[in-house]
Every structure is written in structure tokens, then in C-alpha cells.
Amino acid sequence: MSYKKCYQGKKLGPNHYEMHLWEDDGQHQVVGYKDKAYIECSKDQATHRGLKGEFVKPIIDWKFSKNPEYSSDNTPGLHFQDMPPYQKFLIDKYGTNDDPSTTHKEIFFDIECEMGGALTEEYIESAPKPITSIAWYDKQVDEWGILILDKKQQLNHTKAKNKEIIPCSTEVELLKKFVAKFKELNPDILVGWNSDYFDIPYLYYRIYSVISKKAANSLSPLGIVKSKRETKFWWKKDQYVDIIGVESLDYMRLHKKFSFRDEPSYKLDVIGEKYTGLNKIEYNGNLDKLFEEDIYTFIQYNFRDVEILKLLDEKLEYLALTKNLSHKGKHNYSEVYANTRTQDGAISAYLLSQGVVPPAKDINPIHKKNYAGGYLFCPTAGIFNYMFDEDLTSLYPSIIMSLNIGKETLVGRIMISPEKLVVEGKEIFDCRHALNDLKQMDQDEKLIIQNPQRRTIEMKISEIIKLIEDNNLAVSANGVMYRTDSDSVLKTILSKWFDERVIYKNKMKEA
């Protein structure tokens, strides 16, 4: 049995937290969790090894802060202290089991409201205009529904086959019925289009202002909704309201992440036509006029937006991909946009399964504006002459595996002199220092080598070549050297994922 979602609750004591967990059985579990780190110790006390062979043991009573005002109290020699407690809890509980859960309740939805000003963040927070309809599709039971504002009382409450139309005489009635329906549906995943930016924040703030904060917060099974407006430090990019206990997956954001191409337009109408052959319902004038003059077509319009979403996922299967990645990284689905969260979780789970404790992240990482050999050109939509396409299979992962790149295999790097990066006042990136390049240079020329501890030494090029060849080091094009006597963790995990990829591709062909 696997998890569907997990959230860190209140603090019970030092490094002791309440965890809210939902698994495939759908039951809400509240579990106490002691967030352990590891500390360096003698060999006879050790239960694990560090990535570089250090002897370590678990510790519960530890302190750590990145804030310079408090860092003097940090426990020295800590390992694996800087991952979110809920993610460490999932790693402890599920280890390297990557199987996604299978009993999610997924709701595709869309809201409509009266037209107003530009949809800025401030405008959405104020939510000044009434919501006129909310449509949804419940995937697990194949049922459709819509709450529609019907001040003229033109409609009757109808349910035909798997589609229900619920008219409401006032917006307050509509919003109250939606809150009740939302609790009844009890979704694990809420899917919309541009919903992280518009639908969810607008709906939340409108319920907040028209009914009450308590009613708005009741959208969460835990009664907790976090918002950028009420939080001093907000770290979620492109998401402004977080309903704790409901995972929001904005299909537009998923498409931008997984499609690997720029679209001429990200309007749902355009994307729907391109990938599903289905457009939005056409009408004359604006939506407000349609709502006033032809409420039946308006209902079709709202349902069609949800239908396009449903068909997009049947075609693109981004939800399944999100689940697979998230379970590999042991994190919630709405965090799939951050690649490092997935990578950190997957690597940590693998290391701990081997009795190795992940190292702490560098508290003072080096930030560089540009990296030689790491230039990426963003695609530009349009028609161009004299272009060709060279598709190298999974270029970056293949480079990582072939060079055996890893934190524990890093030997050092050749420092490129600043003057070599600027020619006639312009930055350049052609500064190759791979083995063959070194052999073409003046063998008596001296270069600076920096080790992983950032200490430097000056060596002749002939000495660097001897170091590389005597130790059978792999060297990247920009002069970074790696050991090859044992596989790095990154190489091991990527090789495993590539093997799985071949299996899945073969199964796809068989199907």
C-alpha cells in the first residue's frame, strides 16, 4: 500500500512532528514522527556510513539553522538534516518502493465569474466579481456536475445519466453548495487549467469574502489553507493558495514542464484543438452576455472546458507521469515542478537503502551566472530557413553516466582564467579542457586545479595529464575530473531508471 498525500502537522517537541498521511485505503492517519539526522561518530558507535565513508549514527536532539544569527548553535558534523521532515518520513516508511497509489479521487474542474478587470494577482486576491458557475468531472465514478447561478429561475435541478445540473438562485447558495459538494467528493487531486494562478485562488478568496474564512478553509480536510496573502515567507512559485490535504495539479503548468516545447498560445481552446481536436464552445459577444441571454449554451461552455481537460489527460497522461515521478522522489504531487525535490528524494532513498547517509547540502553554494558548456537556447516559435535537428538521446543523463558524475566521485576541476572567458569585451564559452584538448596545449603551461574543498594548487599541464591517466579519471569538456573506480550514486540511479524506461517502452509497443 502506498501513500496518496502526506503533510507535516503541528510540532510536538524538538524535531518531533505530527504527520498527516493518506494511503490507498483512504483512511486519514495521524502519526508522530521524530525527525532524525545523523552525526559523525567513532567506528564502534556507527550504524551507517557517510557518502565519503564517514562513520555516523542517528541523533534526535540536534539543532540546525541557515540563519547566521542562530547558526552558532548548530550541532557540528550533521548529515541529512536539511530535508523537509515529511519527505524524510516518506523515505523512512516506503524506502525505495516507487509504486504509485492507485485509489486517488481526481476532480477536473473549472469556474466562471463575471467579467472585471485584468487578472492580476492583486485583482484575484480581491475577488470582486460573483462566481456564476462551477463545473467538475469526477474521474473515478465518471460523473459530471455543475452549479449554475440562476437568478431568473430558468432551470430545474436535473440529473440525466451521469450529468447533474444544480441551479442556485444566489451566489451565496452556489458557494455554500459547492463547499458541501467538495467535502462530499473529498478529492485527493484537483485538476484545472491555469488553476494555480486563477481558479483556486479566486474561488478561495471569493468564498472567504462572501461567506467566511472558516467556510473557505473547510475546503481542506484539515481545515488549513495557506495563502501568499497571509504568509510572510511564501516559497511556492506560481501557486498562491495551497489547500492542505488536496493536491493541486495545474494542467497548463504540467504541459509547460513535460511537453519540452513552446506553444504559440497556452489558451485552453488552442491546446485543446491541437491535442484533442476539441475546441471551446463558440458564442457571440462576451461571456457575461452569453450568461444573461443563453444560459443553456453557457452551461455547455463550462462543461466543455472540463471535457477538454479530461481528454488532454487521456491523451498526454501527465497525471500518471506526475505520480510516478513523485513516488520516486517521495514527495507530494504538487511539488513535481521542482526537479531537485524529486532528485533529492530518490537519491536519499537509494543511499539509505545501501546503509549510506546522504550528505548535507552546501550551506554556502557557489552561484555562477554562466557555466562553460552549459548554455541552453530557449526555443522560439516560428518558421526558419536552413535549420536541422540533431536529437541526442537523453543527452544530460548520458553525460552524467559516461563521466561518472557525482558528489562523491568529484576529484577537482581546472579553473578557467577570467581573461580566457572574455575576448574583445565579449563573454565566450569555448574553453575546452578535456584530456585531448590538454594534450594540444603547451605542456609547460600552468593551470590552477581546485579540489572539492575549494582549495587550489597550480600544476603544469603535463602533470595534470599524468594525474588523469595514472588514476583513470574521466574529464568533462570544461575540465571537471571524476573517479571511475566505482559508480557514482547518480550513475547508479540513472542506469536503473534507463533500464525501467526500456521495459516500459517495450510494454507500450506490446500494448
Regions found by a protein language model. Name each.
Residues 92, 98-118, 213, 219, ...:
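Extended, Lys/Arg-enriched charged tracts that mediate electrostatic binding to polyanionic substrates
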Residues 392-511:
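Helical catalytic core of nucleic-acid polymerases
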Residues 1-84, 209-210, 214-242, 277-282, ...:
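Non-catalytic nucleic-acid-binding interfaces of large nucleic-acid enzymes and RNP effectors
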Residues 184-199, 203, 246-343:
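Acidic, Mg2+-coordinating catalytic module of metal-dependent nucleases/exonucleases
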Residues 3-48, 52, 83, 89, ...:
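Conserved RNase H-like, two-metal-ion catalytic cores of nucleic-acid enzymes
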Residues 288-420, 424-427, 508-511:
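Common nucleic-acid-contacting/processivity interface regions adjacent to the catalytic cores
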Residues 152-263:
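Conserved DEDDh/DEDDy metal-dependent 3′-5′ exonuclease domain
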Residues 116-119, 144-146, 200-201, 257-259, ...:
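Short helix/loop capping segments that flank catalytic or ligand/cofactor-binding pockets
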